[in-house]
């Protein structure tokens, strides 16, 4: 029997459209995020980190060029993943499909120009509301995944599933994680032998016709 594995990948979200200033982002949040995750990568060679938003990378390149070169090294070593595909984590309710598509194009073009790779997902931890056509827009952009934690804050219809296939009205579909837990969620203890994680993923996948790699 093939051994089943689930991987945990760390992430950090710096909200550059929230109510603090760009100066706060540049002077406080970016260097703190970089230093902590650089230390973790050096201490744990198998540590993996997702960081989204091409705009944040632009700020790093402008204000912390040495750190930007270090990120390039970590990307080559597959410790660091430019994620989210978009240039900025914008609202996806009011903007037109073309606007969302251009946001993806700008973001992934930046990733390709600077790191030689493109992201395959949309990561929107802090946006409220996701239209039914979003899977079609994401799929047509050549992406395969979507993640949010915002539904844990509240939803008129609840959380449809934790992990599974999200299908647009026209039948286009993407893999989606709708319940990535809130920012304050803590996972305690050693979960390496916790089969409930695998079983939970398998159950959700079965209910939404999601193909798993086992």
Positions of the model-derived regions?
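Catalytic-domain carbohydrate-binding cleft regions of carbohydrate-active enzymes
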Residues: 1-214
